[in-house]
Each structure stands twice: as C-alpha cells, then as structure tokens.
C-alpha cells in the first residue's frame, strides 16, 4: 500500500564564518546537497510533500586535511541510497538503513585516505521524518533538536571525549563544556576503529507545528539552548529563522563554519491516515453486510 505523505517547510543555510579559509560543512535535504567545493555561503529552501523526508548535516573536521571532501562523501552516500531511504516505513527500517549508510560512507572515506594519504573526517547528523516515525542519528558533535508545543528536546548526543567523561561521572556537563576535549570527536565518519562506529540513535513523534533543527557545532557551540529555543519559537518562515541563527552565531564570534537545516511540519499526515483507516473499516463493514445479506438470501 502506498504510504501517506507529510509536508515540511524546509530551509538549509551554510556560511563560512569569519575565521576559516574554507567552508567544510555540507547539508542534505531530500536529495539536494552542495555538489561543489570552495563554498563560502549556500542556501536551499523548499516546501516538500513526501512520504519520507531525509535531512542531514555533515561537518568536515577542520583539523584534518580534507574535511570538505569527507563531508561531501557523507552527503553523496545519502544520495546514493535514496531508494532505500524512501522505502523506510518504521524506526527499525530507519535504523538499519542509517547504519548501512554510515558504514558505507566510512568505508569510502577510508579508501580515499588510503589512496591520497590525506587525513579526513566528518560528523554526520541525520533526521528521517515520516507519518509513522521521526528517527535521528549522529556521529560527532553536530546537534539535532525538536521543538514542540511542550518545549525543546535534543535528539542527538555529542560523541566527544568530553561527553565520555560526563558519561563516566568524571566531570559535570558544565565542566565538559569548558574542557578542551569538548571538540575532540570520539566517533566520526573516517574512523578506522570499525567496532566503535556506532551512531547515537533516538526517535520521537512529530505533530503539525513542530520544528526540527540540525546544526553544526559552529552554531551549537556558541548559542546556548535557550537562545536556540527562542529562535525556533518564532512564527516566521523557516528561512528567516535559519538566517537568525547564523546571524546570532556570527555575533557570538563563532570561529567555525556554520550550517543549519530547519524544517517546520505543516501537515503530519495523521488526518489522511485516519481517513484511510476509516475508509478501510467502512469497506470491511460494507463487505460484511453484503455477505450477510447474500447468505440470508441464499437460505
């Protein structure tokens, strides 16, 4: 049976920032991504009605040689798996496909490293949204949020050495936020420890009016959660909200590339699903009535 589409208003914006010589971030929105290098700023806007929406941010690791290449490999691998992504119907489907994409992208980056001798790596933060599930996964420190009428929730978990110290109880969240290790990634695309290559995964439900956000650490490192929440609480178009987040990060003197992907749920598909179920129920009821009448007539 054909799936039920949902409608999202989406905006993606990336900016090189004030201190970096090149932009090593990339984004992916339902098949659209930055397909060239030496990008200072880029944006994408759309209102899409799809059965499955896929959005992602890949932040190339600036301390390595070819971070932009690693980020490009991340988004092109998503593009190469478009058919599998569109076939997702459940959270289990999403998890299986996402982990396969992560392994494929990681393998491609390792092969590139072996071929060129240049070190590279990238974060990976992805959302899959459909009428039946909202699935999130991340490698590294790119963040994922959902803002609902009840508040804002972070769906990602930083995969950094500082976060590992927090998880072990060695330091507090506040101490980790000030530590050097907060930007040292423990997991990322391009790592050679394949046993540790496991993204953080989470899920949620979406409703009409919810706001979804994926951003690189050039934004999340300098903007506290209450500032992000204030921006996401606006009724303005999502492209304006995206611009506001970038502008806020610039005012905070973010020294990194900055990328945001924002989506507002315009139609969560639940009304259409209810109508379909009601139609099926009525069809079954009508069939039972007709069968009963036929049996009675034959008797």
List each model region and its residues.
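PP2C/PPM-type serine/threonine phosphatase catalytic domain
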Residues: 1-299
